[in-house]
Amino acid sequence: MTTPIVDFVRQYAQSGTARLHMPGHKGQSLLGCEPWDITEIRGADELYEAEGIIAQSEANATRLFGTAHTYYSTEGSSQCIRAMLCLALQGAPRTGKRPVLLAARNAHKALLYAAALLDFDIRWLWPAPEDTGALCSCPVTVQALSTALEELAGQGRTPFGVYLTSPDYLGGMQDIAALSAVCDAHSVPLLVDNAHGAYLRFLPGGSRHPIDLGAAVCCDSGHKTLPVLTGGAYLHLGPKAPVQEESTVRNALALFGSTSPSYLILQSLDACNRLLSTDYPARLQECCDRLAALRARLNALAAAQGTALPLALDSPAREPMKLTLDAAALGLTGQALADHLRQNGMECEYADPRYLVLMFTPENPAEDMARLEAALAELCARGIPPAEPPAEHRETFCALARQAEPRLTVRQAVFAPQETIPAGSALGRVCALPTVSCPPAIPIVVSGEVIGPAALELFAAYGVETVSVVKPEKF
């Protein structure tokens, strides 16, 4: 497969041309990558008006992903999420009422920023009581989605889209095929934040990518699970996308993107196309198989110590290339287990009061898995001390769903005068900008909602120390 962006930049870097244009480093090495860092010179094409090498490279990606059209982003899935929602709004029938999005609650804060900028309401899908208990998870059933759509219809409102995060940060996956069928029956596009699942298209056992499973539009962060530089992402349009006009899509991306996209990131997306067209899918499957075997060994290791819980979360419905550990099986918090691994030369992706997330790809040498297994075996060999049952937040999350009272629209709250106060003092105040770290960038309380007792309890559990609230005299 061709790599038109890589080829052009390499030829330019080797040409000896005087760089009388941006960027200011002029190709002189400070970090080593500068010779290949260029701007929109003649022949380099323009990301948001692509007709040359970028368009050719995106066409390669479109064929690889099997979409109606795949577009590049150099600003991560955050840019793609905003563009995706903008396009869904543009493609929705005009009703004369405020637009509303039906969304699973475990959404990245980029969704809230989009709601503030595009000024739409959000009706939240909450997990069933038996499925709740973690900030990052929000399983949505066919029945729950059908009921929510019917309730909105009974109110004379049709959402301009259904928005799901799959895979989620802990590796859980929604039943996209079944949920897309529900959306089709109600003539509503399914929009999927697939930031953690770009590789799902390329599993030899069969694609688990949202577009192949019926989603109308989705975004992938190539940099999360493929060998792409940070910021490299894709906006994928399926045949059911509400807007297909190329200029409209590029304008939506441009609305939320810099006019100086990184050509280093574009080259990495371009080079990844060639890699995906070779034996990389087989390497992905090999990585998934090795992780499946590792999960089994870790669970056997923990069981031999008499643990009541499996150490590695494992089920066919889970994302295969993410290893999520339940630290409670070892009598630890996720943060404490992360510290133990850090002391043994390993850095994790995410840790919370209970879970630890480790992300592997084919680029990890086999020694990484061996080092992890040895560190966990050493921890088990010390003996797992008797511990209290892990803190259950199920009731607290259920209470959060009951207490989540919107006082302002997201836009009103985000743009209102605000102040930052200690989280413990925020009871009864209205959330302005969500104060959350990334990862996981999932807010406990969203902009415009009143902060209730359950939120305070979860702030403490997840280490949220301050919150941004609307100044009371301003509404």
Where are these regions (language model features)?
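Conserved C-terminal alpha-helix-loop-beta "cap" of PLP-dependent enzymes
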Residues: 299-454, 458-463
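N-terminal "arm"/small-domain region of PLP-dependent enzymes with the aminotransferase-like
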Residues: 1-52, 188
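Structural signal for conserved beta-strand scaffold positions within catalytic alpha/beta enzyme cores
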Residues: 72, 124-126, 220, 350, ...
